[in-house]
């Protein structure tokens, strides 16, 4: 019997790791990856950090260049897909070529959620999703330039740190009452707000742009009535899933391709993962996790499901953020207001713990990354703790 053909659509973390996972799990059939980017699939996290700060930055490939040939994966870079061919099982390219598939994995990622008021500025307005975006930003983030960043989420704050380190004068505008409101607990939000302010970043909370004038500088009038002048304007206010091909194929979508716990779409032969995917939970709610690790996890899950193998057990959600000299790592459940702190954040070394009835369900480390491994095990096992012992620095964590 002829082995099936699997096609991967996308050129990022989830796409590359799906190819790797399929081969690692024993798939020997024909395997293709189609991407609209010219580069080999590359790591996205460095775009807001090392790609802006290093003297001679280089893209970091997810997999070495030789891996693709050695593992007989056919790379099709810089191509545009016209249709997925859900009914015909024939992927069609803009140049007219068609490629048969038996199973499909979609990992087309996401674009920056548009902000029309700023998009009207054209090339004077920036977002950050791809290598080309980072290259353009690197050129304009020059010392003494005035930079306005709209959005104080993870990307916004990382960009604020990088721009400040490049000598720019940075102002951040945030509609909410805090920074990193979606994915950091209150004490970490407080720490990051102070950290950026101490670095010279002006952060304007509970505010938004009402009017923009494009002249020698960009003039931005805020809801508060204040007018800012900027040489560079950047925004990051969320994502818009690149799900157009899926919508045209009549797959279920909701600002993302709706998948189940096996990364399967409403079509049993089509799977999706990474930022383009949104998971329907058992209670019917939709949930998206935008992180490097989630892209890896969903790639592995989809590969297992496509091959009819048991699904891997998911670890607690984890992501990291580098801002200035700080490395913050977030693991587990970030919800809840009753967080404990081990150490002193003012020394830039601390761990915040989230206990629920004595059970550790989440944590954030500040320049204590080596502690993530035991913390991950404790969260997975549902380990209980005495709060006093957990926050006592005289007691080594590994002894608890």
Swiss-Prot record:
**Entries under SUPFAM superfamilies matching the protein:** FAD/NAD(P)-binding domain (SSF51905), FAD/NAD-linked reductases, dimerisation (C-terminal) domain (SSF55424)
Entry keyword annotation includes NAD: yes
Entry-linked Pfam families: Pyr_redox_2, Reductase_C
Q: Which of this chain's residues are annotated to bind FAD?
A: 5-36
What Enzyme Commission number(s) does the record list for this chain?
1.18.1.3
Q: Does the keyword Transferase apply?
A: no
Catalytic function, reaction form: 2 reduced [2Fe-2S]-[ferredoxin] + NAD(+) + H(+) = 2 oxidized [2Fe-2S]-[ferredoxin] + NADH
Q: Which InterPro entries does this UniProt record tie to the protein?
A: FAD-oxidoreductase/Apoptosis, FAD/NAD-bd_sf, FAD/NAD-binding_dom, FAD/NAD-linked_Rdtase_dimer_sf, HcaD, Reductase_C, Ring-hydroxylating_dioxygenase
Subunit structure, per the record?
Answer: This dioxygenase system consists of four proteins: the two subunits of the hydroxylase component (HcaE and HcaF), a ferredoxin (HcaC) and a ferredoxin reductase (HcaD).
Function according to Swiss-Prot or TrEMBL: Part of the multicomponent 3-phenylpropionate dioxygenase, that converts 3-phenylpropionic acid (PP) and cinnamic acid (CI) into 3-phenylpropionate-dihydrodiol (PP-dihydrodiol) and cinnamic acid-dihydrodiol (CI-dihydrodiol), respectively.
- This chain belongs to the protein called 3-phenylpropionate/cinnamic acid dioxygenase ferredoxin--NAD(+) reductase component
Source organism: Escherichia coli (strain SMS-3-5 / SECEC)
Q: Which gene encodes it?
A: hcaD
């Amino acid at each position: 019997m002829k082995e099936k053909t699997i096609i991967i659509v996308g050129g990022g973390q989830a796409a590359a790791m799906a190819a790797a996972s399929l081969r690692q799990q024993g798939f020997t059939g024909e395997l293709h990856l189609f991407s609209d980017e010219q580069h080999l699939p590359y790591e996205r996290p460095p775009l807001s950090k090392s790609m802006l700060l290093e003297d001679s930055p280089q893209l970091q490939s997810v997999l070495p260049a030789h891996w693709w040939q050695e593992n007989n994966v056919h790379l099709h870079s810089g191509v545009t897909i016209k249709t997925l061919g859900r009914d015909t099982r024939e992927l069609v390219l803009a140049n007219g070529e068609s490629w048969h598939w038996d199973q499909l994995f979609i990992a087309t990622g996401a674009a920056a959620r548009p902000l029309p008021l700023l998009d009207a500025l054209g090339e004077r307005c920036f977002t950050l999703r791809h290598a080309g975006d980072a290259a353009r930003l690197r050129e304009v983030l020059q010392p003494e330039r005035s930079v306005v960043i709209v959005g104080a989420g993870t990307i916004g704050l990382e960009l604020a740190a990088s721009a400040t380190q490049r000598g720019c004068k940075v102002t951040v505008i945030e509609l909410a009452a805090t920074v990193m409101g979606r994915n950091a607990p209150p004490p970490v939000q407080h720490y990051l707000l102070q950290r950026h302010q101490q670095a010279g970043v002006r952060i304007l909370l509970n505010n938004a742009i009402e009017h923009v004038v494009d002249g020698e500088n960009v003039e931005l009038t805020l809801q508060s009535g204040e007018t800012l002048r900027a040489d560079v304007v950047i925004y990051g206010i969320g994502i818009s899933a690149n799900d157009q091909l899926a919508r045209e194929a009549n797959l279920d979508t909701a600002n993302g391709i709706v998948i189940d716990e096996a990364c399967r779409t409403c079509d049993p032969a089509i799977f999706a993962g990474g930022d383009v995917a949104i998971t329907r939970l058992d209670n019917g709610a939709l949930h998206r996790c935008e992180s490097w690790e989630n892209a890896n996890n969903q790639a592995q899950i989809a590969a297992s499901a496509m091959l009819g193998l048991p699904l891997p057990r998911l670890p607690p959600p984890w992501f990291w953020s580098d801002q200035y000299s700080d490395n913050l790592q977030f693991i587990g459940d970030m919800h809840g207001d009753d967080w404990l702190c081990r150490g002193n954040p003012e020394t830039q070394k601390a761990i915040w713990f989230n206990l629920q009835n004595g059970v550790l369900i989440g944590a954030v480390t500040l320049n204590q990354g080596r502690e993530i491994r035991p913390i991950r095990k404790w969260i997975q096992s549902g380990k209980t703790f005495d709060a006093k012992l957990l926050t006592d620095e005289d007691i080594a964590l590994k002894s608890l």
